[in-house]
């Protein structure tokens, strides 16, 4: 359902929006906001955010900058992740298994890749 809605917004942006000109008081425009909201949050929540934005875009509104809110991780997702960690024995992705290696390669070890790479190298 997400992609047909995104296609409708793109169709509007390519056909109707150029005829109307820049009339939106907000940045990004309502159609760009809607596209981003549906792409980021999905069809249901993105459509609700877009409808609320269009309702706010009226002659009595001052306008301004109004970005799409970031996607939040749902509470049930955090509970599921905690249960999964407890089942696996408490290891998490933040604590990688080192298998006898030091967690941070020291620059004193000449065989480590960190000793060969300059601290100002790209990607370091």
From Swiss-Prot:
InterPro entries for this protein: Membr_insert_effic_factor_YidD
Function: Could be involved in insertion of integral membrane proteins into the membrane.
PANTHER family: MEMBRANE PROTEIN INSERTION EFFICIENCY FACTOR-RELATED (PTHR33383:SF1)
Composition bias, Low complexity: 103-124
Record protein name field: Putative membrane protein insertion efficiency factor
Alphabetically ordered keywords of this record: Cell membrane, Membrane
Region described as Disordered: spans on this chain: 86-124
Stretch forming the signal peptide: none
UniProt subcellular location: Cell membrane
Key word NAD present: no
Protein topology in the membrane: Peripheral membrane protein
Entry's Gene Ontology cellular component terms: plasma membrane
Family listed: Belongs to the UPF0161 family.
